[in-house]
C-alpha cells in the first residue's frame, strides 16, 4: 500500500494474482489478534508520574493517563522514559501477539493495572531493551491501532522464473495496480539526471 492504493480485500487480490500472475502460497497474519474487540484494549498512554518501585530497584512505578479520567498505576521494568512520555499501553484483558492474556496483577506487592509495551511485544521490531516511546501528538486513550500498524495481513507468493520483476515489492505493486486500476506511486528516490548532450541509444535485436 506504500506504492498502490486498493480498496478490495486481500483475499480478492490473492485470487486475482493466482489466476493471472503467480502462485499464492498463503495469507498469514502478524501482530495483535483482531478478535473479540481485542484491538480496543491497546491505547495511547501519557506518563504522568514515574519513579522507582518501593520494593524493587529495577522496576518503575508509573501513573499513566489512558483517557479514563483517573490514571492507571502500571509497573514497568524499562527505564528509557519518564514523566511526559507518550507510550503504548495494553489494558487488562488484552491478548498480546504471543498469545498471552494480560491480567491485573501485583508485582512486588504493588498493583499493576496494565502494561507499557516494547516494540517486540507488539511485533513491530526486535527492540526489547526499552519500551516503545511514541511521538507526541496522539491524545491519551486514542486507539493504538490509529497510530501503529498493530495487525497486518501478509501475502506470500511463489514467483516463477519468467517473472523476476515480482521479486521486488514494487513489482508486485505494479501488478496490483494493473489488475485493479489503481494509481502506481513513484519509487522512492530520485532518478539520475542524464549528463551531456547525447542521449543513450538502446536497440533490441532478434538473434
Where in this protein do the model-derived segments appear?
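Phosphate-backbone binding interfaces of nucleic-acid-interacting proteins
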Residues: 1-207
